[in-house]
C-alpha cells in the first residue's frame, strides 16, 4: 500500500496526460499530491521531509505551469528535485558530518562507516545523474517522450539503482548474519555449560 501511495500522484499524472494533456495532468498532479499528504494525516503517520519537499515543489512548479501555460516549469521541477536530493546528501555529509542514507537505514543495517560513506556518495551521484538526464530529455525531446521518461524511465532507474545498492550491501549483510549466528551458537554453548 505504501508503494501505491508514493507513486499515486505519478500514476494520476500519466493517465490524465494521456487523456487530456499536460495542463490537466499538472492540475491532477497537484490534487493527487494534496490527497497523498491528506492520507498521511488521516493515518496519523509522520510525513517524511522528502514528501514535504516534493509536495512543495509540485504545488509551486505545477502552479506556475498552469498559470503561465508553460510546461517548462514542470520539467524543471524534476531536475530540481533530483539536484536537491544530491546536494542534500553531499552537503550534509561533507559539512555537517551527517550521513542521510545512514540516518534512514541504520536501524535495519549495521555497516562499516566507509560503506555508509560510499553508499551516500553513490546515491548523491545517482540523483545528480537523474537530474542531468531529466534536463537533457525534457529540453531536447518532445513532451510525450519526456512524460514517458519521467513516469517510466526515472522510476525504472530508481528501481534498478535500488536493486544494485542491495546487491552491493548483500555481502555485508551475510557477514553480519554469520557474526550473529556465531554469537547465538556461543551463547547457547555458554548456557549449556552453566
Curated annotation (Swiss-Prot):
UniProt entry tagged with the keyword Transferase: no
Sorted UniProt keywords: Cell inner membrane, Cell membrane, Membrane, Transmembrane, Transmembrane helix
Subcellular location per the Swiss-Prot or TrEMBL entry: Cell inner membrane
Major subcellular location class: membrane
Disulfide bonds: none
CC annotations in GO: plasma membrane
Membrane topology value: Multi-pass membrane protein
Keyword Metal-binding: no
Transmembrane segments: 3-23, 47-67, 76-96, 119-139, 149-169
Pfam families: IspA
InterPro entries: YciB
Function: Plays a role in cell envelope biogenesis, maintenance of cell envelope integrity and membrane homeostasis.
Record PANTHER family: INNER MEMBRANE-SPANNING PROTEIN YCIB, INTRACELLULAR SEPTATION PROTEIN A-RELATED
Similarity annotation: Belongs to the YciB family.
Protein name in UniProt: Inner membrane-spanning protein YciB
The species this protein was found in: Colwellia psychrerythraea (strain 34H / ATCC BAA-681)
